Regions:
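Active-site helix of classical SDR
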Residues: 113, 150-153
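Conserved NAD(P)H cofactor-binding loop of Rossmann-fold oxidoreductase domains
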Residues: 81-86
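A short, exposed helix-loop element centered on a Lys and neighboring polar residues
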Residues: 113-114, 159
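SDR active-site lid
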Residues: 167-237
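Substrate-binding pocket helix/loop in short-chain dehydrogenase/reductase
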Residues: 89-90, 97-100
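Conserved glycine-rich cofactor-binding loop
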Residues: 11-13
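Residue(s) in the substrate-gating loop at a strand-loop-helix junction
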Residues: 134
Length: 263
């Protein structure tokens, strides 16, 4: 049965792959992008591939955009995928960058979800919301701690929504990617250079040496996008979905180790 599915952050990465895959499966997909040039690229690529796709503008930090989108579209599934990463040592990271990241990763995603939840409840119909969080929701990665904090927050909100909305037959799930080569992680690391200066900041530049190795071993994003698609369409999916399995096992071990970690 065809579903009406709206995806945020669909201009690239997991959101774009998932949007195209869902459209190929025959679902009515609304792929949203933050700015108009991204929309043009999506429209052109969908046309080139012969894919029927509705493309619209949605900046999740823009209340006018959110009001317009929630008013215009009746959907069955929301895939809340838009997000940004600001990197750097949290003890020195500029607070304005952390706030702007939380605006996108937490408050924007929640405000959009609230708009569609109200429609689901008012119209007395079921719905599903899938939040793309991160493996960083479940543990804290050094030098992207503030980003992980935003994903911790969104994961807690998602878990609260899951319980609170169960009486209304609204399903909630999270998808928690490991390290995939969408360009997202690379851009997040690049943000450090906008403010970090080894001459004035006390964190040594050598602290970031492990980052290059991690970025050199990123996974193919196709499998993660397929995971998001499967979770969105599965009416009985798990709430939390860490992918790949090796990342899930790694995170579980880190969580177990946290109970005996010293200060």
């Amino acid at each position: 049965m065809s579903k009406r599915i709206l995806i945020t952050g669909a201009a690239s990465g997991f959101g774009k792959i998932a949007a195209f895959d869902l459209a190929k499966k025959g679902h009515k997909v609304i792929a949203t992008a933050q700015v108009y040039p991204q929309m043009s690229d999506l429209i052109r690529e969908a046309k080139e591939q012969g894919i029927e796709l509705t493309v619209d503008k949605l900046d999740v930090t823009n209340a006018t955009d959110i009001a317009y989108i929630t008013r215009k579209y009746d959907i069955d599934i929301l895939i809340s995928n838009a997000g940004i990463m600001e990197g750097g040592p949290v003890a020195e990271q500029p607070l304005d960058l952390i706030r702007s990241m939380f605006d996108v990763n937490v408050f924007g995603g929640l405000q959009l979800a609230q708009g569609f939840i109200k429609k689901f409840v008012d119209e007395k119909r079921p719905g599903k919301i899938v939040f793309t969080t991160s493996m960083g929701e479940l543990w804290t990665v050094p030098y992207v701690a503030a980003y992980c904090a935003s994903k911790h927050a969104m994961g807690s909100i998602a878990e609260g929504l899951k319980t609170e909305l169960a009486p209304f037959n609204i399903k909630i799930a999270t998808c928690n990617p490991g390290i995939f080569g969408t360009g997202f992680n690379d851009r997040g690391v690049d943000t450090i250079s906008r403010w970090y200066d080894p001459e004035t900041n006390f964190t040594p530049s050598s602290a970031f040496d492990d980052t290059a190795e991690a970025l050199a071993n990123q996974l193919d994003p196709q499998s993660m996008a397929e995971c998001i698609v499967d979770v969105a369409l599965d009416e009985n999916s798990n709430f939390r979905n860490v992918h790949p399995k090796e990342t899930e096992d790694f995170v579980k071990q880190l969580q177990a180790d946290a109970w005996t970690a010293k200060s």
